[in-house]
Amino acid sequence: MKVFCGRANPTTGSVEWLEEDEHYDYHQEIARSSYADMLHDKDRNMKYYQGIRAAVSRVKDRGQKALVLDIGTGTGLLSMMAVTAGADFCYAIEVFKPMADAAVKIVEKNGFSDKIKVINKHSTEVTVGPDGDMPCRANILITELFDTELIGEGALPSYEHAHRHLVQANCEAVPHRATVYAQLVESRRMWSWNKLFPIRVQTSRGERVIIPPLELERCPGAPSVCDIQLNQVSPADFTILSDVLPMFSVDFSKQVSSSAACHSRQFEPLVSGRAQVVLSWWDIEMDPEGKIKCTMAPSWAHSDPEELQWRDHWMQCVYFLPQEEPVVQGLALCLVAYHDDYCVWYSLQKTSPEKNGRVHPVRPVCDCQAHLLWNRPRFGEINDRNRTDQYIQALRTVLKPDSVCLCVSDGSLLSMLAYHLGVEQVFTIENSAVSHRLMKKIFKANHLEDKINIIEKRPELLTPADLEGKKVSLLLGEPFFTTSLLPWHNLYFWYVRTAVDQHLGPGAVVMPQAASLHVVVVEFRDLWRIRSPCGDCEGFDVHIMDDMIKRALDFRESKEAEPHPLWEYPCSSLSEPQQILTFDFRQPVPLQPIHAEGTIELRRCGRSHGAVLWMEYHLTADSTVSTGLLKSAEDEGDCCWNPHCKQAVYFFNTTLDPRAPPGSSQTVTYTVEFHPHTGDITMDFTLSDALDSGC
């Protein structure tokens, strides 16, 4: 059965109705899931297995049957571990139907159908009793309901319900306990992901400073956690202000509460500085004694950095304090962690909340609009002084005193730079209510509300009256649009340029004047694991899961690239970067496709995991901004990526299986095509084997 789905096209800006298979969302969810990453997490799997064996033994030693409840079973892996460890029966709960169906097949293939019952329900819908899903309560509770924030996937409500309705009192739990840790730091880099810094502009009239509005300065920021691969942040980018502080623990073997709570820890700052950011992670203890532990600690806080397990399904958290606070070495303070049923947040106080009688605040919510429009990388991009200087220098070469400037980018400060550099008149298109409100606040804070005209409408609806009857002599864009996911989605700027063509005057300048698509073939240190088949996991056959992921990828995404912030995922280039498509913004979008095909020579030995693609914007003939590689790869091929943008990764499925030989490919052939009607870029890459690679 086919269904029609309406989608906004991020490149063309139009709404399209697409005919999709009725299960297309299932395929997409499976293809983009972390199932493969979890199966490759050797440390996690081994620790769970050890904890399950110990829990089953404790129940058996009491002379009881071991009845297991496995919530969020996924592949059924943990249930199969339990049965192998001696459990008498397992009830494996999985709410996602395609996953539950796969679990049934995996359990059957491994010969456990008589001892594992897969229940396709949410755990809160499971019933107990003679006619229920479970005839009686379980005495062992196994779960893997955790995300990077620990509680963000609803672990607390699920545990709370399970203890009340599904498991016996004093049951065994695997994991037994979780502890959340925090460390206070000062970091201009991470703080730049949350606040707008002043921007200094040298003009013919002296220095001008663009400042953030007071609402933005006071705003607590976005409520969502910032989860990153913290080990990829250079130690030079932050100063540690406190020891690692255990903030709170949850004992999963007892009744759990999902009610809001706060936990404070007194500490003495190690050095004086500005408290801006809380780094946080957690560990889980699989047994009551805490001998079997799985930790998310970053390298500097890990008991054995050499044994650090890479994983992408659990990372580390960055929390931003509502305001930066000065701290003095040795002067005691309280770090306070708050949580509700799904979120954690932090504050810094002079005394503990219990002593000062304060009621803990509600979850922080953005009230300045900026955190609704700009995500964390976008804040970092706007605060990047080198990038801003590059735009300023480019603007100086194209501006004239009588220029009429039209700026097209979501929530961009380019219009303010253009005004300060001396153009006659500036218009900016902000076609969303959020961007319109934010830019209005920023203009007002800088006394520019009557200097820059905001047009709140779609570009194709622009009229001469909106431009006060004037022709545009300078069309500006970064470009940046909030709807963009893949690098080339910002080609929406080209479609806007085409839509406003009638409003451009003779000899109008477009900046950037062009863009180009670039590619490099890489070997990832770890990211390949998220798309790699597992085969066997801790002795269990999970090929069915591999096949399901492959079918989901083949359904849509096997010929598509996916966005990843590659500064978090180290890789080495195996080829030189290569330009494969160009887009001339000085001309409207063409009617015919832009096609390219060719060969990429591999110049370094390694396993070719995929091709990385990114855009470069040519502001002028002499100035280019890259959203991908920032400099040529070093001798070893190590890549340095733009930290404010996601790059596109096209995985080569044939090289993702770690059991396959590295191969002897020396070239990669490609076919890439830009389709003007849809704005899509289709691509295909093929590894070509050589008789003798010399590797």
UniProtKB/Swiss-Prot annotation:
Lineage, uppermost ranks: Eukaryota, Metazoa, Chordata, Craniata, Vertebrata
Residues bearing PTM Omega-N-methylarginine: 32
Record gene name: PRMT7
The enzyme's E.C. designation: 2.1.1.321
InterPro entries in alphabetical order: Arg_MeTrfase, MeTrfase_PRMT7, PRMT_dom, SAM-dependent_MTases_sf
Listed GO biological process terms: chromatin remodeling; genomic imprinting; peptidyl-arginine methylation; regulation of DNA-templated transcription; spliceosomal snRNP assembly
Highest taxon, organism lineage: Eukaryota
Active site per database record: 144, 153
Protein name: Protein arginine N-methyltransferase 7
Record localization: Cytoplasm, Cytosol; Nucleus
Gene3D superfamilies: Hnrnp arginine n-methyltransferase1, Vaccinia Virus protein VP39
Keywords from the UniProt entry: Chromatin regulator, Cytoplasm, Differentiation, Methylation, Methyltransferase, Nucleus, Repeat, S-adenosyl-L-methionine, Transcription, Transcription regulation, Transferase
Subunit structure: Homodimer and heterodimer. Interacts with CTCFL, PRMT5 and SNRPD3.
Main location per the UniProt record: cytoplasm
